[in-house]
Amino acid sequence: MSGLIGKNVGAGCTYFELYAGGAGAALDLLLGGNVQRIVLNDADIHIYYFWDSVLHYTEDFLRLMWDTPVNMDTWQRERAVYDENDLPDENNPGNHSPLEIGFATFFLNRTNRSGIITKAGPIGGANQTGKYRMDCRFNKGNLAQKIERIAARANDIEMHNEDTLAFIQQNVERLSAPHSFMYLDPSYYKNGSSLYLNAYNYQDHENLSNLMAGLRDLKWMISYDDVEENHQLYEGFRTAQHELNYFLQQKRKTNEFLVFSDTINKLVF
């Protein structure tokens, strides 16, 4: 990704990642000095609360992390916090604070199999008899260092909680700027509902394709699962396939389907 941005955008890039999730690519680019600013968006309020807590309530978040034991009792409690329907907003304090919900999201991501929050159980199983235990990805010292590095760049990180298509339509002028680059990583076409809380259906995927068809002169890339339906949705666009390693129970290889705007030199990817 850094090569793609360096070749097509250059220095001073504002990088938009609009299905942010863990925002791994965006943070690597920012902390690696490859972009100047990142703009994150996720329609999932749980993800938004996590990032808002890390960026603006860092000490409280870290204190909660250090004080929280990593065991099944905690897992059950954090699962209940995450699943709570009475979420706080400007008119309702809810049963749990944004910080508590953001931390529950973080805890489940670090302790669940493959980091899947919504429909996966803890690493090692409910009885913690598996080869690996739920704390194997919860090294508090390492996590604290990462969080502190991210929080130190809070002024260069902008976070939103909006529908992605609406965000794009409302920010076309910003996205059209010479040093802007947009990366879209929507939910998988197949099996997306088992991985994402706000998984897209066919109409959602089609709406995204139709929107991007009118924005080919901007600088952007979309990554998808490599299935025939996506090839059909993006027929006529500039596309490529890219081999990807991923972990769901065991290491596997698959092809990622990439879609590029007309202004992007995809050969440097």
Predicted stretch roles:
Residues 21, 51, 106, 220, ...:
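A residue-level signal for conserved active-site and pocket-lining positions in enzyme catalytic cores
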Residues 197-269:
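Long, positively charged, glycine-interspersed low-complexity recognition regions
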Residues 22-25, 44-46, 111-114, 164-167, ...:
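Short, solvent-exposed loop/turn segments at secondary-structure junctions
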Residues 27-29, 50, 170-171, 192-196, ...:
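A short acidic (Asp/Glu
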Residues 8-73:
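Conserved S-adenosyl-L-methionine
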Residues 3, 10, 55-183, 187-193, ...:
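SAM-dependent nucleic-acid methyltransferase catalytic core
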Residues 11-15, 35-37, 154-157, 212-220:
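Short active-site oxyanion
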Residues 38, 159, 239-241:
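Conserved beta-strand scaffold positions in the cores of enzyme catalytic domains, especially
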